[in-house]
Curated annotation (Swiss-Prot):
Domain of life, per lineage: Bacteria
PANTHER family for this protein: UPF0178 PROTEIN YAII
InterPro entries: UPF0178
Protein name (Swiss-Prot/TrEMBL): UPF0178 protein Jann_2168
Family membership noted in the UniProt record: Belongs to the UPF0178 family.
Pfam families in the cross-refs: DUF188
Listed NCBIfam families: PRK00124.1
Length: 156
């Protein structure tokens, strides 16, 4: 655990599919909170002292493992991965998805169960598909920014 995480002053980004990295950077600059961008391989990111990049490698769940190991009380994790969110909540982190929804200890069990049911349904459709997610919108981006500000205020 680093000094950053001991102080509860760290934002961890599950970076491979995160559409709100720029919003996170902007907010981090304003609050002077370090950001650790974690991904399987290199992602472009600002050259700024608050931003660090961790390349976790291609092993299955390598990036998730790096994030879960750094998760601690007071850290903020941004991920769309429900199973990673569950691990981070267990470690005491505040966890948001990229649309600004908060994963909580009260809701994560139902979200994990729903994920499992949907995976079973998709597997049973044998390539027919059930549609994907709606495109990421400006409203989603705004909702995330508002939720991020609220979450960071709770970390102080």
């Amino acid at each position: 655990m680093t000094d950053e995480t001991r102080q509860g002053r760290l934002i961890l980004i599950d970076g491979d599919a995160c559409p709100v990295k720029e919003e996170i950077y902007t907010c981090a600059y304003r609050h002077k909170i370090p950001v650790r961008l974690v991904a399987a391989s290199y992602l472009r990111h600002p050259d700024h002292p608050l931003i660090t990049m961790v390349m976790a490698g291609d092993a299955f769940d390598a990036a998730d493992d790096v994030i879960a190991e750094a998760a601690a009380p007071g850290t903020l994790v941004v991920t769309g991965d429900i199973l990673l969110a569950e691990r981070c909540l267990e470690a005491g982190s505040v966890v948001l998805n990229h649309k600004g929804g908060a994963y909580t200890a009260n809701s994560i069990g139902a979200q994990v169960a729903t994920r499992a049911i949907m995976a079973d349904i998709r597997a049973g459709l044998d390539g027919q598909g059930i549609g994907g997610q709606k495109p990421f919108s400006k409203a989603d981006r705004s909702a995330f920014s508002n939720a991020l500000e609220t979450a960071l205020r709770r970390l102080k």
